[in-house]
Amino acid sequence: MKLTIISGRSGSGKSTVLHILEDRGYYCIDNLPASLLHSLANRVFTDETTIPNVAVSIDARNISADLEQVPNILNDLKEKKLPIEIIFLDANSQTLLKRFSESRRKHPLSDENIGLKEAIDKESELLEPISVMSSLSIDTSNMSLHHLRDSIKNRIVENKETGIAL
């Protein structure tokens, strides 16, 4: 059993990674409330659980007070020697601005008072504590969806199947 935590700035490819893992047999949860991470980990690592691999996305859509607790929760889980992998996806701000303008989606932190650039910068600050704890960081700035899929398959899924640790 393994718990994979996917985090990163909006527009960096987290949903794509979750879909890839789901296609490979992972049980995936997008936008898990950070306050439920500890409970989920306890459930995943009990003897009764038959789910071999779980992947969750935790990002800036969370309540900020809950998001601030993620590093403490991750440290607690790591101290228990649980098999947890933290993958942090990112892209440079210019690429994220372009992706949001092309998709016409609203950034989760933007509103009538906070523009897109400011929201992207704020998100970097919010997610920095998770970023520094990651076991794998992937910069998707110059990656196509196809390249990201191949990278995830090669670095995570196939290495898991052969028992190679990243």
Language-model-detected regions and their locations in the chain:
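Conserved glycine(s) of the Walker
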Residues: 13
